[in-house]
A protein has these predicted regions:
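Auxiliary, metal-adjacent structural segments of Zn-dependent hydrolase domains
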Residues: 2-96, 159, 163-166
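Short amphipathic alpha-helical segments
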Residues: 25-29, 112-116, 120, 148
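Short acidic/His/Gly/Ser-rich catalytic and metal-binding motifs that mark active-site loops
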Residues: 86-90, 129, 133-138
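N-terminal, positively charged nucleic-acid-binding surface of large information/translation enzymes
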Residues: 89-91, 98-101, 108, 138
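Short pre-active-site segment immediately N-terminal to the catalytic Zn-binding motif
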Residues: 99-119
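Active-site recognition of the HExxH zinc-binding catalytic motif
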Residues: 115-135
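Post-HExxH zinc-binding segment in Zn-dependent metallohydrolases
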Residues: 132, 140-177
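Pan-zinc metallopeptidase signature
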Residues: 178-231
Length: 231
Protein backbone atom coordinates (compact mmCIF):
# COMPACT_ATOMS: atom_id res chain seq x y z
CA UNK A 1 0.00 0.00 0.00
CA UNK A 2 1.23 3.54 -0.72
CA UNK A 3 2.48 5.37 2.34
CA UNK A 4 0.38 8.29 3.56
CA UNK A 5 1.99 11.40 5.00
CA UNK A 6 0.41 14.58 6.32
CA UNK A 7 2.11 17.91 5.73
CA UNK A 8 0.78 20.97 7.58
CA UNK A 9 0.14 24.03 5.46
CA UNK A 10 0.48 27.62 6.66
CA UNK A 11 -3.03 27.61 8.11
CA UNK A 12 -2.55 24.43 10.10
CA UNK A 13 -4.57 22.17 7.79
CA UNK A 14 -2.99 18.88 6.73
CA UNK A 15 -2.27 17.93 3.14
CA UNK A 16 -2.31 14.14 2.94
CA UNK A 17 0.09 12.71 0.38
CA UNK A 18 0.23 9.07 -0.63
CA UNK A 19 3.25 7.87 -2.59
CA UNK A 20 3.56 4.95 -4.94
CA UNK A 21 6.06 3.41 -4.55
CA UNK A 22 6.06 4.24 -0.83
CA UNK A 23 9.84 3.91 -0.58
CA UNK A 24 10.64 6.34 -3.41
CA UNK A 25 14.17 7.55 -2.72
CA UNK A 26 13.39 11.28 -3.09
CA UNK A 27 10.01 11.23 -1.35
CA UNK A 28 10.80 13.59 1.54
CA UNK A 29 12.39 16.49 -0.39
CA UNK A 30 9.86 16.04 -3.19
CA UNK A 31 6.95 16.22 -0.76
CA UNK A 32 8.23 19.52 0.62
CA UNK A 33 8.34 20.94 -2.91
CA UNK A 34 4.85 19.63 -3.65
CA UNK A 35 3.41 21.20 -0.49
CA UNK A 36 5.10 24.51 -1.35
CA UNK A 37 3.52 24.42 -4.82
CA UNK A 38 0.06 23.84 -3.33
CA UNK A 39 0.52 26.86 -1.06
CA UNK A 40 2.04 29.05 -3.79
CA UNK A 41 -1.02 28.54 -5.99
CA UNK A 42 -3.47 29.24 -3.16
CA UNK A 43 -4.76 25.67 -3.15
CA UNK A 44 -4.02 24.82 0.49
CA UNK A 45 -7.67 25.25 1.40
CA UNK A 46 -8.85 23.35 -1.67
CA UNK A 47 -6.74 20.20 -2.01
CA UNK A 48 -6.65 17.81 0.95
CA UNK A 49 -5.47 14.54 -0.59
CA UNK A 50 -2.83 13.87 -3.25
CA UNK A 51 -1.95 10.46 -4.65
CA UNK A 52 1.48 10.63 -6.27
CA UNK A 53 2.72 7.86 -8.56
CA UNK A 54 6.25 7.67 -9.93
CA UNK A 55 6.92 6.10 -13.31
CA UNK A 56 10.40 4.81 -12.55
CA UNK A 57 10.76 3.29 -16.03
CA UNK A 58 10.37 6.66 -17.75
CA UNK A 59 13.50 8.83 -17.71
CA UNK A 60 11.74 11.73 -19.46
CA UNK A 61 9.92 14.66 -17.81
CA UNK A 62 6.34 13.71 -18.62
CA UNK A 63 3.73 14.46 -15.96
CA UNK A 64 -0.02 14.65 -15.73
CA UNK A 65 -2.83 15.18 -13.25
CA UNK A 66 -6.35 13.83 -12.90
CA UNK A 67 -9.17 15.00 -10.64
CA UNK A 68 -12.92 14.88 -10.24
CA UNK A 69 -14.36 18.02 -11.80
CA UNK A 70 -17.08 18.10 -9.13
CA UNK A 71 -14.74 17.65 -6.16
CA UNK A 72 -11.32 19.29 -6.11
CA UNK A 73 -10.31 18.04 -2.68
CA UNK A 74 -8.37 15.09 -4.11
CA UNK A 75 -6.16 14.63 -7.14
CA UNK A 76 -3.82 12.07 -8.67
CA UNK A 77 -0.42 13.04 -10.02
CA UNK A 78 1.91 10.97 -12.18
CA UNK A 79 5.56 11.93 -12.65
CA UNK A 80 8.22 10.38 -14.85
CA UNK A 81 11.58 9.99 -13.16
CA UNK A 82 13.16 12.82 -15.12
CA UNK A 83 11.05 15.42 -13.30
CA UNK A 84 13.20 14.97 -10.21
CA UNK A 85 16.57 15.80 -11.78
CA UNK A 86 18.03 18.63 -13.86
CA UNK A 87 17.63 18.79 -17.65
CA UNK A 88 21.37 18.20 -17.89
CA UNK A 89 21.07 14.91 -16.03
CA UNK A 90 18.12 13.87 -18.19
CA UNK A 91 20.26 14.45 -21.29
CA UNK A 92 23.05 12.42 -19.72
CA UNK A 93 20.62 9.59 -18.99
CA UNK A 94 19.43 9.62 -22.60
CA UNK A 95 23.01 9.05 -23.74
CA UNK A 96 24.22 6.56 -21.16
CA UNK A 97 21.01 4.59 -20.57
CA UNK A 98 19.53 4.56 -24.06
CA UNK A 99 20.42 0.91 -24.64
CA UNK A 100 20.40 -0.33 -21.05
CA UNK A 101 17.59 -2.09 -19.27
CA UNK A 102 16.36 -0.92 -15.90
CA UNK A 103 16.55 2.57 -14.48
CA UNK A 104 19.49 4.79 -13.50
CA UNK A 105 20.34 5.01 -9.79
CA UNK A 106 18.73 8.02 -8.12
CA UNK A 107 20.49 9.57 -5.13
CA UNK A 108 19.40 12.38 -2.82
CA UNK A 109 22.14 14.71 -4.05
CA UNK A 110 20.75 14.45 -7.60
CA UNK A 111 17.36 15.89 -6.65
CA UNK A 112 16.49 19.15 -8.42
CA UNK A 113 13.92 21.11 -6.42
CA UNK A 114 13.49 23.53 -9.32
CA UNK A 115 12.77 20.83 -11.89
CA UNK A 116 10.22 19.15 -9.66
CA UNK A 117 8.64 22.48 -8.70
CA UNK A 118 8.19 23.24 -12.41
CA UNK A 119 6.28 19.99 -12.87
CA UNK A 120 4.19 20.42 -9.70
CA UNK A 121 3.22 24.02 -10.39
CA UNK A 122 2.25 23.31 -13.98
CA UNK A 123 0.11 20.28 -13.20
CA UNK A 124 -1.59 21.88 -10.21
CA UNK A 125 -2.42 24.94 -12.33
CA UNK A 126 -4.69 22.71 -14.39
CA UNK A 127 -6.74 21.89 -11.31
CA UNK A 128 -6.65 25.52 -10.15
CA UNK A 129 -8.01 26.72 -13.51
CA UNK A 130 -10.88 24.25 -13.32
CA UNK A 131 -11.59 25.27 -9.72
CA UNK A 132 -11.59 29.00 -10.45
CA UNK A 133 -12.64 29.27 -14.12
CA UNK A 134 -14.23 25.96 -15.06
CA UNK A 135 -11.52 25.05 -17.56
CA UNK A 136 -11.53 21.31 -18.19
CA UNK A 137 -11.13 18.97 -21.16
CA UNK A 138 -13.61 16.27 -20.23
CA UNK A 139 -16.56 17.86 -21.99
CA UNK A 140 -14.75 18.30 -25.31
CA UNK A 141 -14.53 15.79 -28.17
CA UNK A 142 -11.60 13.40 -27.83
CA UNK A 143 -10.26 14.60 -31.18
CA UNK A 144 -9.81 18.15 -29.83
CA UNK A 145 -8.26 17.43 -26.44
CA UNK A 146 -4.57 17.33 -27.30
CA UNK A 147 -4.80 20.67 -29.12
CA UNK A 148 -6.89 22.29 -26.37
CA UNK A 149 -4.50 20.96 -23.75
CA UNK A 150 -1.54 22.57 -25.49
CA UNK A 151 -3.35 25.93 -25.71
CA UNK A 152 -3.99 25.58 -21.98
CA UNK A 153 -0.32 24.70 -21.38
CA UNK A 154 0.81 27.90 -23.09
CA UNK A 155 -1.51 29.98 -20.93
CA UNK A 156 -0.27 28.26 -17.76
CA UNK A 157 3.43 28.63 -18.51
CA UNK A 158 3.02 32.26 -19.53
CA UNK A 159 1.50 33.09 -16.14
CA UNK A 160 4.10 31.11 -14.20
CA UNK A 161 6.92 32.84 -16.05
CA UNK A 162 5.48 36.28 -15.33
CA UNK A 163 5.37 35.41 -11.63
CA UNK A 164 9.01 34.34 -11.73
CA UNK A 165 8.13 30.76 -10.79
CA UNK A 166 9.76 27.62 -12.19
CA UNK A 167 8.20 26.89 -15.58
CA UNK A 168 9.01 25.87 -19.11
CA UNK A 169 10.64 28.76 -20.95
CA UNK A 170 8.88 30.66 -23.71
CA UNK A 171 11.15 29.14 -26.34
CA UNK A 172 10.61 25.58 -25.12
CA UNK A 173 6.85 26.04 -24.92
CA UNK A 174 6.79 27.59 -28.39
CA UNK A 175 8.50 24.51 -29.84
CA UNK A 176 6.01 22.15 -28.19
CA UNK A 177 3.14 24.36 -29.37
CA UNK A 178 4.44 24.15 -32.94
CA UNK A 179 4.86 20.36 -32.86
CA UNK A 180 1.36 19.89 -31.47
CA UNK A 181 -0.57 22.33 -33.65
CA UNK A 182 1.38 22.67 -36.90
CA UNK A 183 -1.08 20.38 -38.69
CA UNK A 184 -4.12 22.55 -37.91
CA UNK A 185 -5.34 24.17 -41.14
CA UNK A 186 -4.70 27.80 -40.22
CA UNK A 187 -1.58 27.36 -38.11
CA UNK A 188 0.72 29.15 -40.55
CA UNK A 189 -1.65 32.12 -40.72
CA UNK A 190 -2.59 32.60 -37.06
CA UNK A 191 -0.41 30.27 -34.97
CA UNK A 192 2.10 32.89 -33.83
CA UNK A 193 -0.60 35.39 -32.90
CA UNK A 194 -2.55 32.77 -30.95
CA UNK A 195 0.60 31.73 -29.08
CA UNK A 196 1.40 35.34 -28.12
CA UNK A 197 -2.15 36.00 -26.96
CA UNK A 198 -2.20 32.89 -24.77
CA UNK A 199 1.27 33.52 -23.36
CA UNK A 200 0.32 37.05 -22.31
CA UNK A 201 -3.19 36.30 -21.04
CA UNK A 202 -4.05 36.59 -17.36
CA UNK A 203 -7.72 35.61 -17.35
CA UNK A 204 -9.28 33.09 -19.72
CA UNK A 205 -12.09 30.61 -19.57
CA UNK A 206 -13.20 27.52 -21.48
CA UNK A 207 -14.95 29.55 -24.17
CA UNK A 208 -11.85 31.60 -24.92
CA UNK A 209 -9.64 28.50 -25.23
CA UNK A 210 -12.22 26.90 -27.50
CA UNK A 211 -12.34 30.05 -29.64
CA UNK A 212 -8.56 29.98 -30.12
CA UNK A 213 -8.77 26.37 -31.27
CA UNK A 214 -11.56 27.17 -33.71
CA UNK A 215 -9.43 29.99 -35.09
CA UNK A 216 -6.58 27.54 -35.71
CA UNK A 217 -8.87 24.94 -37.24
CA UNK A 218 -10.74 27.27 -39.55
CA UNK A 219 -14.27 26.63 -40.86
CA UNK A 220 -13.78 22.91 -41.56
CA UNK A 221 -10.48 22.08 -39.84
CA UNK A 222 -9.88 19.28 -37.45
CA UNK A 223 -7.53 19.31 -34.46
CA UNK A 224 -5.18 16.38 -33.86
CA UNK A 225 -6.35 13.65 -31.53
CA UNK A 226 -5.19 12.53 -28.11
CA UNK A 227 -6.02 12.85 -24.48
CA UNK A 228 -5.16 13.95 -20.97
CA UNK A 229 -3.62 16.98 -19.38
CA UNK A 230 0.08 16.70 -20.10
CA UNK A 231 3.02 18.99 -19.82
Amino acid sequence: MPRQRATADGGGAALRVRWNPPDFALREPAERVLADAVRELGLAGVIHDLHVSIDAQNRDDHAYIEWNTHDHRAARLWFALGNFVTPKRRRMWSRTWARRSGTPPLMARQFSARSFAEACLHELCHLKDDHESGVDLSGHPESDREALNELWNVWIDGRLNRRGLPAMSRGERRRVFARTLVSTPRYSAVGERVFRALWRADHLGPRELRAYLEELKGPRGDAPARSRRRR
